[in-house]
Amino acid sequence: KGKYHGLPIYEMLGGACRDKLKVYCWIGGDRPDDILRQAQEKFAQGYRAVKMNATEELHYIDTYDKVDAVLGRVAAIRDALGNEMDIAVDFHGRVHKSMAKILAHELEPLRPMFIEEPVLPQNNEALREIAGHTAIPIATGERMFSRWDFKSLLSDGYVDIIQPDLS
């Protein structure tokens, strides 16, 4: 209908609702020593948000040494750049529900922008419980491929950000 009327679809849906969009830059995280340097480089380039891999694969119940390592990586950025840099933490589904609840709770004082894919999509029912243990927004969706995969996430409201992989 947009082509027929010679209008962009967003105009047919009521018009533009914003003229800016916040973007983030991926900085890795598999090499913890590089995290702070990369975040500082992105900040110098004008980015005000980064996403990082702060976790390695964790056991169902793991040690607080590993939790502290995650906190240390995120805290290094927060301490160096303050609240001017938003930090998203991608779990890549490497974490089981029990550890995801602990990590989300422990990360709260560092004020992440969001946590991404705390569990794999096959375990999306765990997101409800994880969401109940944190105020941090939860993002997921890059490994979900149909509208039916997203239906319960949207209707139940326990995910704040959906990230379909359009490629």
Model-assigned labels for residue ranges:
Residues K1-I87, R94, S98-K101, H105-P109:
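N-terminal capping/lid subdomain adjacent to the active-site entrance of alpha/beta enzymes
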Residues Q38, A126-E129, S152:
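A short acidic, amphipathic alpha-helical/loop segment
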Residues G46-R48, L81-N83, H105-M113, E129-I138, ...:
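Glycine-enriched alpha-helix->loop->beta-strand junction motifs that scaffold or abut catalytic
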Residues K51, A88, H92, R111-P121, ...:
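Catalytic beta/alpha-barrel core
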Residues M99, E125-A126, W148-D149:
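Short acidic active-site motifs
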Residues F145-L154:
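Beta/alpha (TIM)-barrel catalytic core signal, keyed to glycine-rich beta->alpha loops juxtaposed to Asp/Glu
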